[in-house]
Structures are given as C-alpha cells and as structure tokens.
Amino acid sequence: MSKTSRSRINRRSIDNNICINSSCNKKKFPDNVVYRNKEKKIIHEECKICFNKRAKLYRERNKAKLKEKQHKWYHKGGGKEHKKLYDKINLEKSNMRDKNRYATDLNFRMKKILRSRLYKVTKKGQYSKKMTEYLGIDINIFRQWIEFQFDENMSWENQGSYWHIDHVIPCKSFDLTEEEEISQCFNWENMRPLEGIENDIKNDKILPDEIKKHKKLVLKFKKKINL
C-alpha cells in the first residue's frame, strides 16, 4: 500500500471515527481512543483495543532489543535523572501512601519488616534466627548463593545502590500473614541479586522464562557445594 493510499485511509478512519483494522472496524468512542497528540486532539488510526494488542505483540517480539535500549538510556543518565526527579517530586506523596498502607495492609507491613531483616542479615551481617529459618539455609551459604549470581559489577558494597535482592516469584504472590507462605517467599531458592533498573522494570511481574532459568541455576549451585 502506498503512503498516499495509507494516509487517505487514515484520514478517512479518523474522520469517520472508525478503527483502521478491517477485522475490527469499531467506532472510536471517547473511552476507546489512543491520542497521538492529546493537546491537539489528534487520535490514532486504531482503537485502544487494537493498539494495545499490537503494542503487546511488538514488546513480546522485541524483548531483547527494547531491554537493551532501556539499559542504554538509563545508564547514559536519562533514566537516573528521571528517577531522581520523580523521587524528589513524589517522595512526600509516596511516604504518606506507604505510611497509610503500612498501617492498614498487614501483607505490605510484613513485606517491609521481612525485607528490612533480610537487608540487615546480608548487608550488615546481623544474625537472625527467624530469618535463617525462612531462608532454609545458613546465612553464610546464602551469601555464597547470592555471590554465585553476581555480575561483574556487583559487590556487597553496592547492594542497595547498584543492585537489590529480588524475589523471583514476587512477594505479591504470597500471603505474608501466613508462616508457610513467608517461608516459600523468603526461601533462598526464590532469591537473586538484580540490577536496580531490572528490578524496577520487573516490579511484581511473574516471568515464567526467568523462573525456569533460575531453577536451573539453583540446581547448578547445589551441585557445586554438594547441597
């Protein structure tokens, strides 16, 4: 299809408020539009449903490319500066939200307490009998396990600034008011060091491919130390 033909179709679709996709042809009502420029009220040729489907497919097909692009942007300073500015603007709001949630959401409160204990155990070397029980292994072996997964830039000195301890299956997937689920969530096999930006991107997502890869790494470590 030529550019001229496409532009005619696009203009006609926008004028008629109809989605450009022949398999759809839904009307783009106010709640079903994607704006190219909201200020100028220029809308996308596709309806929101079709646009989101296509965007999702693109992300799935170009995971590696998008990840690399995001890394480059972040490490050139764009991401760091953006995060710094965002944190500065939203710090008070975020603190208030967390404070309210800490008071009302038991699961959130438990996550904060347990993560704080884990940080003290790994970073500051403070012994915690309960955390050792949750981890399921000796603290020294746990530190070896984390080190086993370090990349070339990771060290215990830059924990918290360059990398964080990530729960491969996120905390949100567990009921942290139940002892058994705490033990599953904070078990050493569910932990890994993850670069800050990667951790932000992952957030609370469950990533089946990452889980599968992580399980292989667990087996490799067990074999290495005869666990």
Curated annotation (Swiss-Prot):
Q: Keyword check for Coiled coil, yes or no.
A: yes
Q: Which domain of life is it from?
A: Viruses
Tell me which family the UniProt entry assigns to this protein: Belongs to the mimivirus L246/L426 family.
Spell out the coiled coil positions from the record. 52-100
Keyword terms: Coiled coil
Record carries keyword Coiled coil? yes
Q: What is the protein name stated in its UniProt record?
A: Uncharacterized protein L426
